[in-house]
């Protein structure tokens, strides 16, 4: 029996997918628990319209992500930090510091969780940091750490 899933179902599919399910499983579990709707002509038409809307939204999100990627890659973030002997930093520069500097210096709002660093920055110099803008879209940001 063809059904359109309204929720994620283990070993069957994700919400919004049209799948073939065994008749008994669909009638006794999926439909009564509102995990799926039967794939009638009317429901298929509604499902196709929703899929078209989702694809349009996805294209718009990708377009915005690419614009943000361009902005990030065309900017440099300069962070001033206190240093001790041998130009070693007191503390370190974290993704939160980079997020704050991006917002203050360029007005770009990027979540600190999307800024990927192998380790915190602990010395002066220029560093490249990866910013995950969208799934499969990454931007390279140049971070310049200078002493006070």
UniProtKB/Swiss-Prot annotation:
One of its GO terms (molecular function) is rRNA binding. Signal peptide: none annotated. Keywords: Ribonucleoprotein, Ribosomal protein, RNA-binding, rRNA-binding. The keyword Secreted does not apply. SUPFAM superfamilies: L9 N-domain-like, Ribosomal protein L9 C-domain. It comes from the Bacteria. InterPro entries: Ribosomal_bL9, Ribosomal_bL9/RNase_H1_N, Ribosomal_bL9_bac/chp, Ribosomal_bL9_C, Ribosomal_bL9_C_sf, Ribosomal_bL9_N, Ribosomal_bL9_N_sf. GO terms for biological process: translation. Disulfide bonds: none annotated. GO terms for cellular component: ribonucleoprotein complex; ribosome. Transmembrane segments: none annotated. Pfam families: Ribosomal_L9_C, Ribosomal_L9_N. The keyword Ribosomal protein applies. Belongs to the bacterial ribosomal protein bL9 family. Binds to the 23S rRNA. This is Large ribosomal subunit protein bL9.
């Amino acid at each position: 029996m063809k059904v359109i899933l309204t929720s994620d179902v283990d070993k069957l599919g994700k919400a919004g997918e049209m799948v073939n399910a065994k008749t008994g499983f669909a009638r006794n579990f999926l439909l009564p628990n509102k995990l799926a709707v039967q794939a009638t002509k009317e429901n298929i038409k509604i499902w196709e319209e929703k899929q078209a809307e989702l694809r349009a939204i996805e294209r718009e999100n990708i377009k915005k992500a690419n614009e943000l990627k361009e902005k990030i890659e065309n900017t440099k973030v300069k962070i001033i930090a206190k240093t001790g002997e041998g130009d070693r930093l007191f503390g370190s520069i974290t993704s939160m510091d980079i997020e704050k500097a991006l917002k203050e210096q360029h007005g770009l709002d990027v979540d600190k969780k999307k800024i990927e660093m192998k380790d915190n920055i602990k010395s002066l110099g220029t560093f490249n940091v990866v910013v995950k803008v969208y799934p499969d879209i990454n931007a390279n940001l140049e971070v310049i750490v200078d002493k006070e």
